């Protein structure tokens, strides 16, 4: 079995700075390329217009760890710090722009700035962040026994990919690719 009984996801924060309103643009969907595991969530920064435009809003580390990949729009943070993406928990950040992207080998603390959202590193119709968890090299479904939890918000999948919710107590944020108000979310810390 991939997981030990009673195992829980380590605490993770929403991947942006406190007080900045982002949009939850895609609920659980494919982690990487054609991979069928619905492990990824998408967040878009505040923007004046849609599309692939430069954005100065910061993506922050959801967890502390070692940057084991930083290229082609991708940053991977290895939470156990052993330098191996195939062991323990790893957080994958996709569409991280080249400008100000954190350097390979850097140790980050939760909340540290790691770069800016972009359209780099894969197919994208608009500037956003695609975030995914891996455990022992396997993509972890965003909705399931180890649901994706960020700053107390838990991901819930709809019946079709890209749709879903983030739920925290009685608060619900519904994914929306057009960044409408019901999709707005911010860190309250």
Q: Which role fits each region the language model picked out?
A:
Residues 117-129:
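Active-site loop architecture of trypsin-fold serine endopeptidases
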Residues 4-6, 22-61:
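Short glycine/threonine/proline-enriched tight-turn/helix- or strand-capping micro-motif at secondary-structure
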Residues 54-104, 126-128:
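Zn2+-dependent peptidoglycan hydrolase active-site motif and core
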Residues 33, 44-49, 100, 112, ...:
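Catalytic cores of extracellular degradative/oxidative enzymes
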Residues 1-12, 53, 106-109, 132-189:
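Acidic, glycine-rich catalytic/binding loops that coordinate metals and/or anionic ligands
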Residues 24, 130-131:
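Hydrophobic alpha-helical packing residues
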Residues 9-11, 17-19, 36-40, 62, ...:
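Extracytoplasmic
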């Amino acid at each position: 079995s991939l997981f030990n009984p009673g195992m829980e996801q380590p605490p993770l924060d929403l991947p942006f700075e406190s007080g900045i309103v982002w949009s939850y643009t895609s609920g659980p969907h494919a982690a990487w390329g054609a991979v069928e595991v619905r492990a990824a969530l998408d967040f878009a920064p505040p923007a004046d217009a849609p599309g692939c435009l430069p954005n100065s809003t910061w993506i922050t580390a959801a967890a502390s760890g070692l940057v084991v990949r930083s290229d082609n729009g991708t940053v991977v943070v290895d939470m156990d710090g052993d330098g191996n993406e195939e062991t323990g928990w790893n957080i994958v950040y996709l569409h991280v722009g080249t400008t100000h992207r954190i350097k390979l080998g850097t140790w980050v603390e939760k909340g540290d700035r790691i770069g800016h959202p972009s359209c780099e590193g894969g197919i994208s119709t608009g500037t956003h962040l695609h975030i995914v968890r891996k455990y022992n090299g396997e993509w972890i479904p965003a909705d399931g026994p180890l649901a994706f939890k960020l700053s107390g918000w838990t991901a819930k999948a709809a019946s079709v990919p890209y749709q879903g919710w983030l739920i925290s107590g009685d608060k619900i944020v519904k994914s929306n690719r057009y960044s409408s108000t019901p999709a707005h979310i911010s860190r309250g810390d």
